[in-house]
A protein has these predicted regions:
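Glyoxalase I/VOC metalloenzyme domain signal
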Residues: 1-6, 10-32, 42-86, 100-153, ...
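Histidine/lysine/aspartate-rich catalytic loop segments that bind and position anionic ligands
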Residues: 156
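Conserved catalytic core of two-metal-ion nucleotidyltransferases
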Residues: 97
Length: 229
């Protein structure tokens, strides 16, 4: 059974410059700096800023969404609106704002009713992957443990979830705020039994590799998902 997201990696030319950007505008602290990569704390999720180099690479032009407390949403909107041409969209009773980082990633901040002590960015709640064959990609991620909750294949998009983390699979297209799904994205998801889950997709995966964190799978579109035990 899949659970919450552990990390999202983005490929960036200069990690130090993007670190400064995310510090200035989203107040994300540095957890770790290593050769060619800086790890930021996006609440409970790691945001890994990775320079071009070895595989797995980080995602390019990746749309992803972070949660903020609903009590702080208006403050974030006002603060970011001074610097960015924001796009806003409402999903039911929840509002989201969209802006771009210097590398062309579309960042979404979505309000959520969170505990009173929660403040700032609290975690990753959505990630969008670009895929070549939507039907096959949906089947792959359903067998991995995601559940389809919004089937918009006619529009070129399908939304799946673990219950704690949403994954959108898009055919090449533009979404809200002209966002795109990421290519060669690298992300981690928590699960109780990485090896057992990996066996469900082993025949169709491009590779399945045991790593320190768990089991790393390369899907048919070249995205890497690590099942973290």
């Amino acid at each position: 059974m899949l659970s919450s997201p552990e990390w999202l990696a983005l490929e960036v030319k200069y990690p130090d410059r993007l670190t400064a950007f995310y510090d200035a505008f989203l107040e994300l602290d540095v957890l770790e700096e290593r050769d060619g990569e800086t790890v930021l704390a996006a609440g409970e999720t790691e945001l890994r800023l990775r320079a071009p180099g070895d595989v797995p690479r980080g995602g390019l032009h990746t749309h992803y969404a972070l949660t903020v407390p609903d009590s702080e949403y208006d403050d974030w909107h006002d603060q970011l609106g001074e610097r960015f041409d924001l796009v806003e969209h409402t999903f039911g009773d929840a509002r989201s704002l969209y802006f771009y980082d210097p590398e062309g990633n579309c960042v979404e901040l979505g309000e959520r009713p969170l505990k009173a002590q929660s403040s700032g960015v609290t975690g990753l709640f959505e990630l969008v992957l670009e895929v070549e064959q939507l039907d096959g990609a949906v089947e792959f991620y359903e067998r991995l443990g995601f559940e389809t909750v919004d089937d918009g294949r006619e529009e070129g998009r399908v939304r799946l979830t673990t219950g704690k983390f949403d994954l959108e699979l898009w055919s090449p297209r533009l979404g809200i705020a002209d966002a795109r799904g990421g290519v060669h994205v690298d992300f981690g998801v928590v699960t109780d039994d990485p090896s057992s889950v990996a066996r469900e997709v082993a025949d169709d995966a491009l590779s399945v590799t045991s790593v320190k964190d768990g089991v790393r799978i390369r899907d048919p579109d070249g995205h890497y998902v690590t099942l973290v035990g």
